[in-house]
Amino acid sequence: MRAPYAAEVTVIVGQRFASLGGVTVRNRRLALLWLRRQALRLANGHGSAVRDASPGDVRPVRFHGTDAPESLRFWATDAHRQDDAIRTLEAGFTLHFTVTDPAVGLDVTLAGWHASPATPL
């Protein structure tokens, strides 16, 4: 089995932090695919329940402006951004992409990283 990768979507509002969901998958391409799917779900859902949601999908977020959803959609569909993202993961770095809804001070971060197996003590 290839080295596992993890991906997570988090939200920060003021001083509160929450994980909206995450996965551990067998390779970086699957991690990026999951992050792209979540970015599009969040952008297109705009806080409402999405019909094609699967158990591994993140909880919806209600944005108060259109900039954050548009940024998520652009990141998920732009070939150059996706090439940069996969190269970041290939190089062993953590991938971070954050969008902000300034109307309410909401930050949504998509992150992916190499999840090293635990070393025995």
Question: Predicted segment positions?
Answer:
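Short, well-ordered alpha-helical segments
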Residues: 35-38
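A short, exposed loop/beta-hairpin motif centered on an aromatic-Gly-Thr core
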Residues: 16-33
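Residue-level detector of functional hotspots within protein domains
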Residues: 9-11, 25, 83
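Short, mixed-charge low-complexity intrinsically disordered segments
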Residues: 41-121
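Short aromatic-glycine-(Arg/Gly/Cys) micro-motifs in beta-strand/loop hairpins
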Residues: 1-19
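A broad, low-specificity signal marking well-ordered, structured residues that form hydrophobic/aromatic
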Residues: 5, 23, 108
